[in-house]
């Protein structure tokens, strides 16, 4: 279920609420309690130190996924538009318009408190990220959703399990 309220896209499916980082002072302060996993310190650093500035400069949109009951920050993701270069031949390239899933991380503090919730990342991807990206693609004409995964085979396999393919 989606509703556009002023310039903020609000999504609420009863379990989680998705809001822009800049939608409220409460949202801006909720990131202080975010903790990423062992290999994702850069995602935590981005959320706490750079995401709001990127939001204000219209470089990307950062969405906070909060528990509907407790309002605890469960995870976040950032989206932006991009062009993906495609080699047609060795010397001829073209580009394809896309939406980039620039950042995506689960709050380990939330995961520890909510052990009964399994595969929250996949759930958020399917329930929130894909519908928002499809809406964006219809508005701006993007053909792909892309993610630039670090050279971590486990992470790449995870994205492949969600339907991504290596280029």
Where on the chain are the PLM-derived regions?
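Non-catalytic substrate-recognition and accessory regions of acyl/acetyltransferase enzymes
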Residues: 1-117, 123, 127, 131-146, ...
């Amino acid at each position: 279920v989606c509703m556009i309220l002023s310039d903020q896209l609000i999504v609420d499916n009863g379990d989680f609420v998705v809001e822009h980082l800049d939608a409220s002072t409460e949202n801006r302060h909720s990131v202080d309690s975010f903790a990423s996993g062992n290999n994702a310190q850069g995602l935590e650093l981005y959320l706490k130190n750079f995401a709001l500035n990127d939001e204000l400069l219209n470089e990307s949109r950062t969405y906070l996924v909060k528990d509907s009951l407790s309002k605890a920050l469960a995870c976040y993701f950032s989206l932006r538009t991009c062009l993906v270069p495609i080699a047609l031949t060795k010397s001829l390239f073209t580009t394809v318009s896309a939406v980039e899933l620039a950042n995506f991380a689960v709050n380990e503090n939330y995961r520890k408190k909510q052990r009964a919730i399994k595969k929250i990342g996949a759930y958020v991807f399917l329930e929130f990220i894909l519908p928002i990206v499809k809406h964006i693609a219809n508005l701006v004409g993007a053909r792909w959703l892309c993610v630039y995964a670090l050279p971590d085979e486990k992470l790449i396999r995870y994205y492949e399990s969600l339907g991504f393919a290596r280029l």
